[in-house]
């Protein structure tokens, strides 16, 4: 997210700013938080790539009003499926709505009696995914350290002006680079048995 162009895009309909920590590299949260405060907007982070990343010595997931994490087998916190939304301040109305939407819009559940106040879906995470996630949490720091070492090597050895910066506090879910001849670059990397993807 380009922090220099956020304010010009804010309209009467804007309710929040949602930065994505792409590849695990943290967005400029201090600047974004100031813009949110000035314009009375919520800050909701997409931290799907950034489990274990730090920004200004604080873990990603502790800065925004709300933070979204989604899980996948190839992400830093490797799990079959699922996601989490965390709230960092008292947002009773939003919390109530999230709880209602997580399971078919059901609220006020009391044994066999309940209300369905709104449309919802089945967002419950299955126990299998949750169990794997708990085990993966214990390995997260070690795995992120390996990713950092690989990213450091890419940063020093890949000859391109337009590549992901190196930051000791980044979790490096992905390492992005832009090159003039993508096909040739991919071919060279695959010859060295380095998997390359085209993302977003």
Residue ranges of each PLM-predicted region?
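Active-site phosphate-binding strand-loop segment of PLP-dependent enzymes
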Residues: 1-79, 84-92
